[in-house]
UniProtKB/Swiss-Prot annotation:
GO cellular component: cytoplasm
Presence of keyword Lipid biosynthesis: no
UniProt name for this protein: Anaerobic regulatory protein
Alphabetical GO biological process terms: regulation of DNA-templated transcription
Gene3D superfamilies: Jelly Rolls (2.60.120.10)
Subunit structure: Homodimer.
GO MF terms, alphabetically ordered: 4 iron, 4 sulfur cluster binding; DNA binding; metal ion binding
Induction: By anaerobiosis.
Binding sites annotated in the UniProt record for [4Fe-4S] cluster: C1
Species of the source: Capnocytophaga sputigena
């Protein structure tokens, strides 16, 4: 579903709770982007993989699933591309 910006802006002006929720969501997205930039620029390969698995664990736990046992549905290549690492590095 796509909502034109003008409509969303008008509705959020009339509904303070909607505006607050939108700001919270946008803030979370910006924070996530900043964290990813830091991860890719400052961490070594092992730290990148550690943070990736930790974040997955935390997100699974927040959704009511086990934070300790979960299936990685991404391939090694996908994980490597996401983290800026080679498949060989991920495999080690």
């Amino acid at each position: 579903c796509e909502i034109p910006f003008e409509t969303l802006d008008d509705l959020s002006g009339k509904m303070p709770n909607l505006r607050q929720q939108m700001m919270r969501l946008m803030s979370g997205e910006i924070k996530g982007d900043q964290d990813m930039i830091l991860l890719l620029s400052k961490k070594n390969a092992e730290e990148r993989l550690d943070v990736f698995i930790y974040n997955l664990s935390r997100r699974f736990g927040q959704r009511g699933f086990s934070p300790r046992e979960f299936r990685l549905t991404m391939t090694r290549g996908d994980i490597g591309n996401y983290l800026g690492l080679t498949v060989e590095t991920i495999s080690r």
